[in-house]
Amino acid sequence: MGLPRTSADSVLFSSYNVLNLFQDDTPAGREHYRLIVESVRALDTDVLAVQEIRAPDGKSARARLRQLADDAGMRCTVPGRAGGAGRSALAMGPHGYHAGLLWRDGIEPVPGSFRGYGKGDFWHSLACVTLDAGGPRVRYAAHHATPFGRQLRADQNERLVAALTNPRGGRPAIVGADWNTECADRVRDEDSGEWVLYEPRDPFAGLGWFDELIYQCEWDYDKRGRRRHRADRRPGDVLWAGGLHDVAAVLRAPWQATAGHHPDDSYGVRGISRRIDGIRVTRQLLGGLLSYGVEDTELTRRASDHLPVTVEYVPPAAAPASAAPSVPTTAPAPAAGERGRA
């Protein structure tokens, strides 16, 4: 189990929403924790972004991330600068859901590189740390997007882009997240030359309206006043237009759902399957992307309402620049004789 490694020089990076981990200490809660630990170990990944570490305060949240790291055979402590006190790579979310990063032995966090963004920036949080996994150092991030407010989600995705892509020409970055939205990345159609949606499927198409669709869909009304709805891709488009590229789209991976399988998923019980968990990279890493996969097993289906996703990549110095896929740029202005044509 786990994404097979195809290169001795590669790094495996995974993202996993662990479904209210540590929410309670009941027998069911302890069994849930056991399943999550077993799932993480089975991933056999190098770096892991996690979402939904539950805790009422910072001290207990950081302790719980350390517990998960210890039980999964990973690490999560970033040393301070100049030998200062270290800290767990966890970003507190203002609503009790926290995001963090784990990594295997042999990967070294850059002292003082941890950054956590929560209240005032995001509905949940963003955790970032620079890791040395061989080759150029890369900034890794874990994020959990807001489940409510489509415009808020788009606005906070702008904040995320700013945090991971500035300053211009800075470190390459890779982020694993529960995006809570549909992908809007485009890929070049080799026959027509047009840039088309990688993921044209609308998971809400053909379904009758229900109240929770206000969090995911745009809508209007026909001449008879009947409501028409469609997936709101604007939050996803902010990410792609801002220079954070969905690895699945870049690699043209076959579409595979990450949510909709679990009995606690209010969309899934209506037959809706979605790919809302994913990994995005800045342009510096595009040429090093090797493979992508969703860990869809009986174990991961039982453990969480989200399936873990993994990407294999080689650091920028080991990836030939010519391997980087093309990305669209702004189209040139039409010639004078073409202006005004439909």
Enumerate the predicted regions with their spans.
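Active-site beta-strand/loop signature of hydrolases that rely on acidic residues for catalysis
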Residues: 13-18, 36-61, 140-141, 160-191, ...
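Structured beta-strand-rich core segments of catalytic domains in phosphoester-bond hydrolases
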Residues: 2, 29, 53-137
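Short proline/glycine-enriched turn/loop segments at secondary-structure junctions
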Residues: 89-90, 265-270, 298-303
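Acidic/histidine-rich helix-loop elements
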Residues: 15-32, 149
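Surface polyanion/phosphate-binding segment centered on an Asp-His-Pro turn
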Residues: 176, 295, 299, 304-342
